[in-house]
Amino acid sequence: MEQGKKETPTVYLHDIKREYTQGETRLTILDSTKLALWAGQSVALVAPSGSGKSTLLHIAGLLESPDAGEVYIGGIATSGLSDVERTQIRRTDIGFVYQSHRLLPEFTALENVMLPQMIRGLKRAETVKRAQEILAYLGLEDRVTHRPAELSGGEQQRVAIARAVANAPRVLLADEPTGNLDPQTADHVFNALMQLVKATRVSMLIATHNMELADRMDRRVSLENGHVVELD
C-alpha cells in the first residue's frame, strides 16, 4: 500500500484468501491478495476468464466474504460488522455496474436512478433533483421519462452508471461494463465513467478484457496465481 502516507485508501484488500470446492478438489482463487484503491483513481483489472476477477470485485464490494484477510472501506475493517452494517456500507459507499445493466423495466430512467436514494430514506424532492443532475451530466436529460426498452444499449448502461453513483459512493466497481456494447458505444460509456471519476473523485475498479480502454486508466493490475500484480 503506497500513495500518500496520511491518505486512507477508499478500499484496501489485505491478505485476502478465497477458496472454492470443485468436486473433491479445493481451488484457491485468491491467495494473500492485496490491493489498495485511492480517491479519484481509475484501476483496470485485466486477467483471463476464471482467474478470480469477479470474486475479487464481489469481495471488495462486500457481496462475498473472504475465507481469510480483511476488507477495509474508508479505513474501517468490515470483517466484524453485522450483516445490517455491511448492507449499509454497500448502500452508501459502494456503487456497482455490471455487464448487464439490470434496470427495472417498469421504471423510467429517472425512477431507476432515484431508487437507491429512496431505499436510503431520502426525501423524494431531493432524490428527483440529484437523479436529474446525474442523468443530465451523462447526456441523458431528454431521456428521463423513457423506460429501458425505449433506450439504446449505451443509454441503458449510462442509466445504470447514474444509478450506481446516485448515493455518491466512495468506490465504483464495474464488471465488464462495456462487454455487450459495440466499440463506439463502449467508448462513450467508458468516457462517461472516466468523467465521473474526475468530477466526484470516486475510486473506480473495472474488470475488463478491453486492453485499449485499460490503457487509458491510471493503473492496470492483473491476477496471477491468486495474487494481484501491477502491470507497466
Swiss-Prot record:
| Residues bound to ATP | A47, P48, S49, G50, S51, G52, K53, S54
Subcellular localization is given as: Cell inner membrane
Q: Where is the chain membrane-spanning? A: none
Of the GO CC terms on this record, one is:
plasma membrane
Q: How does it sit in the membrane?
A: Peripheral membrane protein
- The residues covered by the ABC transporter domain are 11-231
Return the InterPro entries for the record.
AAA+_ATPase, ABC_transporter-like_ATP-bd, ABC_transporter-like_CS, ABC_transpr_LolD-like, MacB-like_ATP-bd, P-loop_NTPase
Q: Which GO terms describe its molecular function?
A: ATP binding; ATP hydrolysis activity; transmembrane transporter activity
Q: Does the keyword Cell inner membrane apply?
A: yes
| Protein origin, superkingdom | Bacteria
Might you name a Gene Ontology BP term for this protein?
A: lipoprotein localization to outer membrane
EC number(s): the record gives: 7.6.2.-
Short name of one Pfam family: ABC_tran
Keywords attached to this Swiss-Prot or TrEMBL record, sorted alphabetically, are: ATP-binding, Cell inner membrane, Cell membrane, Membrane, Nucleotide-binding, Translocase, Transport
Subunit note: The complex is composed of two ATP-binding proteins (LolD) and two transmembrane proteins (LolC and LolE).
Protein's job? Part of the ABC transporter complex LolCDE involved in the translocation of mature outer membrane-directed lipoproteins, from the inner membrane to the periplasmic chaperone, LolA. Responsible for the formation of the LolA-lipoprotein complex in an ATP-dependent manner.
Regarding protein family, the annotation reads: Belongs to the ABC transporter superfamily. Lipoprotein translocase (TC 3.A.1.125) family.
This chain's protein is named: Lipoprotein-releasing system ATP-binding protein LolD
Task: State the gene name recorded for this protein.
Answer: lolD
